[in-house]
């Protein structure tokens, strides 16, 4: 049998319908030589700092920076049931190969690979790469499944991004929180985005209305423009251009 793993239940249901996996089980669909199951977003993620050392449970400036030599991964408590379902399916002797059917992108690749590796699965898998859940698109995708190795670099890029977010978030948040004695959350994307909003808000709050003029001069095919003139002209000089 072939085990297909989607990113979320709704996608799993759409794929199962096309493949003929119509028998509903606890956490998966089965039928027509297919088992279709799903993740629930990120089932596996990087462990918190306290998982590396108990002393990191308390935020201290002296412990920074925290940079793991070997990364640990964990499954959130509310997602452990579905992770166990996937583990059991991967170990099912009837399953000979898998299809990664998570979203076609960097994060989708990461979601599947972390589950696959955390489960200790070594069975071969192919990649379904589609951008639509129309029945015809799903059929076309399964007719042209891609080799998993084509997406190894995509997975590595996603994993590097995840680790970078962890390093910036854990260390930045603890640094500024301990320095200013209040929780200040820092993120690789969140913080610069917030800075842009603050900068924009500052410009709006200090904005003062000003009267200005835009001067336009046109003659035949010639156009001249002077923008943002602060002072209104009290006299005018006329320029006569020769015509041809």
Give each language-model segment a name.
Residues 1-159:
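Intrinsically disordered, low-complexity regulatory segments
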Residues 26-52, 191-233:
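Structured, non-catalytic alpha/beta "coupling" segments that mediate domain-domain communication
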Residues 237-243:
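Conserved small/polar residues in nucleotide/adenosyl-binding loops
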